[in-house]
Amino acid sequence: YKISEEYVLLLHDLGFHFDKIGETGVTDFTRHKHDVFSDRFEFKRLTNEGYQFIYFENLPEEVFEELEEISDEWLNGEKEKCFSVGRFDRGYIETSNVGIARDPQNRIVGFITEQPINKEKASFDLLRFRNDVPNELPTFLKLHLMDELKRQGYCEVYQGMAPLAKVGETSFAFLGERIMNLIYKYGHSIYAFQQVTEEKTVYVDQWRPRYFAYMKDSSFLFSALQLLYLIGRGKNKGVTISEEMIEV
């Protein structure tokens, strides 16, 4: 799942069916010659209040211990996911570049991990923070990381999925996609699909479609339920199962 257009025809030739499940947002730095992130309200407000962002290529042991404490607080007793996204693991964290946020009292209150895709593209994976932080802190971390990635010479940053965005909007769409379009429009009790799209639009320069592929002899519903079960075995706080199924 989360398959890009370049693989759709290949998988079709291998006997897979596929349905569109949303679009992934991309920030294209080549369109921004000047720094646009420091003008954002969340960036300015927390900076003025004394919050700091520090970027580590090699994480000190004492910092790792604090991040582990933050991660445990964020999980709130729930299990790590066992599929799709990274988990807080020493080996994983030690091989990742990490950005942290310190509050005015110099306490580490949140962190974000960098996820390189290739020499020109990157994304982020873990984004965790303490319970008592300002609402703007996650955005503060993302903006600072994007600023750092731009300085490093990356051209694009993937912002993750807008689940079900632009799915099943035409009369030629597959039945499964048309059903998902109804969920996108009216499924507010399941997940704030349209709100997520609007929030990501702030950073996004391009939207790129993503697909869910399943074997020809299987049904979309059965395959989707299998995927939900696989993800749900390790669900954690902050991301619903329905979001994780269609999230980058």
Spans of features found by a protein language model:
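Short beta-alpha connecting loops at secondary-structure transitions
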Residues: 181-185
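A conserved beta-strand-loop-helix scaffold within acyl/acetyltransferase catalytic domains
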Residues: 1-19, 23-176, 186-199, 203-204, ...
